[in-house]
Amino acid sequence: MNIFKALFGSKSKPAEEVKKDVTRDFNVLKYDGVRALRERQFDYAIQCLLRAIDMNGADLECRDYLSQAYIATDNLSQAYEQLQKMAEECPDNIAVLLRMADVAYMMEDYTAMADVCEKAMMLDGDNVQV
């Protein structure tokens, strides 16, 4: 029976297998990007992480790594953009807000830095990093 399936069956993969392949490809791209980031191959890390985000834009961990790669390559506006998207998804994350403030400071955008610091202080005024 398998012979007839192989000869006359359709060549398309089942939806479950396609989804499995997409998930595997996403994970490969994500972790290749993380590895490249740790090895200080920032351009390759950016390429991998951008493709991973194209596959799954809801993954905030990829955006975090991408922002780190952008900061390392001095693409501060793009790093700030990724951090803004992360802050929209989880507005109560102090670490994201602090990194946004750092990037705004590096861009010499002091009004944006002050706004982000105010948000962070509203969330946790006792935090010494804020």
Name each model feature, range by range.
Residues K19-M55, E61, Y65, I71-A72, ...:
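Alpha-helical segment of the N-proximal tetratricopeptide repeat
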Residues R51-D54, Q84-E88, E118-M122:
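Conserved structural position within tetratricopeptide repeats
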Residues M1-S12:
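Polybasic, Ser/Thr-rich amphipathic helices
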Residues D25-N27, L60-E61, I94-A95, N127-Q129:
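Helix-start (N-cap) detector for alpha-helical repeat units in TPR-like alpha-solenoids
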